[in-house]
């Protein structure tokens, strides 16, 4: 199977910078802003966006992670134990503008699961969505507010995001 590099390290850096600016513009600054990255690569992207926002505004935005394991609808988990542990952040997200961050937006099911996790225990003012890659093929009425790159794909193709923090390289590849 052939693979195509869609984004290299420099393209990812530029995209993260642009997305940070878009999030700041959307929120009119950093007030009440919280970033939540969906494990695993979304959490690394959230930290990168947090760093960019800090460089731009000289303010550290509260940033955490969402583990959607117990909220997925495509696997059966014995004795589903839904706890607040799905969200890890050192800040209250009630009455905040929460931006969910993920690497690839595809069917929308991961985002639905993250919404379930957030809304189970909190009530944000507003929830937005940022995705490094939007590949289409939605199964749910979900769209990203901030998109790094729209990449039309077939359902047979895979979009792979590699980030230094996990994969020792930065690239977005289609195979």
From Swiss-Prot:
UniProt keyword list: Glycosyltransferase, RNA-binding, Transcription, Transcription regulation, Transcription termination, Transferase
Where does the motif PRPP-binding lie? 98-110
Q: What is one GO biological process annotated to this record?
A: DNA-templated transcription termination
Q: Which HAMAP family match?
A: PyrR
Q: How does it assemble?
A: Homodimer and homohexamer; in equilibrium.
Q: Which NCBIfam families match?
A: PRK05205.1-2 (NF003546), PRK05205.1-4 (NF003548), PRK05205.1-5 (NF003549)
Similarity comment: family membership: Belongs to the purine/pyrimidine phosphoribosyltransferase family. PyrR subfamily.
Instruction: Report the function annotation for this chain.
Output: Regulates transcriptional attenuation of the pyrimidine nucleotide (pyr) operon by binding in a uridine-dependent manner to specific sites on pyr mRNA. This disrupts an antiterminator hairpin in the RNA and favors formation of a downstream transcription terminator, leading to a reduced expression of downstream genes.
**By what name is this protein known?**
Bifunctional protein PyrR
Query: What organism does this protein naturally occur in?
Result: Staphylococcus haemolyticus (strain JCSC1435)
